[in-house]
Amino acid sequence: DTIEAIGEKDFPAWFDLPCEEAQCTRIADYILDEDPYPLKALIGFGLNHRMWPEPEHFQKALKALDFYVNVDLFFSDSSKMADLVLPAASSFERDVVLNGRGGMFFLSEKAIEPVGEAKNDIEIMIGMLRAMQLHDEALEHGYEKYMEYILEPSGVTLEELRAHPEGVKGRVIIPPAFKRYEKEGFHTPSGKVEFVSQILERYKDSHGYSGLPEYRDFREVSGMDREAYPLILNTGSRKPQLFHARTYRVPWLAGLEKATLVEIHPEDAKKYGIADGDMVRVSSPVGSICGIAAVYLNSQPGIVHVYHGNAKGEANDLIDRNYLDPISGFPGYKSYFCKIEKEKGEVKA
């Protein structure tokens, strides 16, 4: 019998699309509830529980596992909970095949040997594959053969790339295809543009999906008390000095901001009696964090923006883990509900 994929019972339309990935946004619940079946072990590659809404709930799920392994460059908080931590080699410690514009291929050779027991992620996968006596065309013959496997369609060999660090142009170049739909159709059950989605219609009775595009304002369907939480919380945008959680490990980059910045529009600052640099508290139905107000003209009135990844004030602590898009299953990182108020005292760095 075919085993039900993780997320399939909650977001079935995801699996009817041309997608080969499980939907893991609710994996913490699946682990803790043992539904649709018990999940006893997990192997993560760079797993960071703080990237999920209500990260403490995910942390609880990791602790409930019988066996948990994390492969990472850093001894992160998620790694500290693991039964086994496998150190990953950095990009300076591994050979990697790259392709560039114009059909060019390159070999990025390691600058140094892996430090300590660090290994390439793929080599770790190959080791697990062999230990479990599994077979995979791309991986089972080792890392060198894996890179050759990647290159094979191009007609370029690994030996050529080693001899030509400037790169080698692929001999088999697949030109851009135009109007592929005329021969292959679209990725829909009918192969046509569907004004009424057959996939969504399939789950109309079981999940309430509508085959026709239907606008539903999230502010009205959430059931949220808008008087208590009148502002919209936005997170996940970019900052030039930060890249997700990883750059918070670099003290001089993290130190550019004394604490978590809470960006608000001048109109909201005036409305709530907040000045630039004030200590504020942002609260939602599931949590609250403190930060420093940054009155920001380029933001929208009614929107509060908090950057993610800062363990000292994590934006995802504010987002309900059940606030998910009903079709795709992705969390509403851009549109949850909050309030803001001035806090007494000073923010500790």
Question: What residue spans do the PLM features occupy?
Answer:
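Catalytic, metal-anchored helix/loop core of enzyme active sites in primary metabolism
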Residues: D83
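Short clusters of hydrophobic/aromatic residues that line enzyme substrate/ligand-binding pockets
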Residues: V97-L98, F105, I112, L161, ...
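Glycine/threonine-rich phosphate-binding loop and adjacent beta-strand/alpha-helix elements that clamp
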Residues: F92-P114, M125, L129
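Extended redox/cofactor-interaction regions of prokaryotic respiratory oxidoreductases
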Residues: D1-K80, S90-V96, V172-Y272
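Catalytic alpha/beta core of large soluble enzyme barrels
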Residues: L86-P87, N316
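Long, contiguous, secondary-structure-rich segments that constitute the structural scaffold
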Residues: D121-G167, H244, R249-E263, E267-A349
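Electropositive phosphate-/nucleotide-binding environments in soluble metabolic enzymes
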Residues: P18-E21, A118-I122, I126
